[in-house]
């Protein structure tokens, strides 16, 4: 397994609407997707589309959400994870485990509609890494 391109940076936010407004008014972002719920992951997300990547804004749906826990420690929000693409998520999981990394959970469908996994921050210099199977079409 070889790491692919950066897909997005995930940012946990207490209010996705307020965060979208900040990216529009402060940074001039004009291409922001409509927020949508992902009940299986306990989050609401949207993407700020940039010329070379995306910023994923993530708001917890309820107190059971892992993002809620993150915001308890970081009330204003902050960088949550960095996502890289891989060709085959199952190959990536096997390679990560073989290399001694802690993979958090099983592959599941992420916000782009492709399979994802997370690698524990202790294996990546304190950064939570999301590995996402490369979308087969445009993204």
Q: Predicted regions span which residues?
A:
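Core segments of cupin and vicinal oxygen chelate
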Residues: 1, 11-54, 92-102, 106-114, ...
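Vicinal oxygen chelate
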Residues: 6-14, 46-49, 69-91, 117
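Helix-adjacent hinge/juxtasegments
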Residues: 54-78
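Short, charged/polar, Gly/Pro-enriched secondary-structure boundary elements
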Residues: 55-56, 123-128
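Amphipathic N-proximal alpha-helical interface segments
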Residues: 60, 129-134
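Hydrophobic, ordered structural segments
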Residues: 62, 75-76, 83-86, 98-104, ...
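Intrinsically disordered, low-complexity, positively biased terminal segments
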Residues: 65-68, 104-105, 116, 121, ...
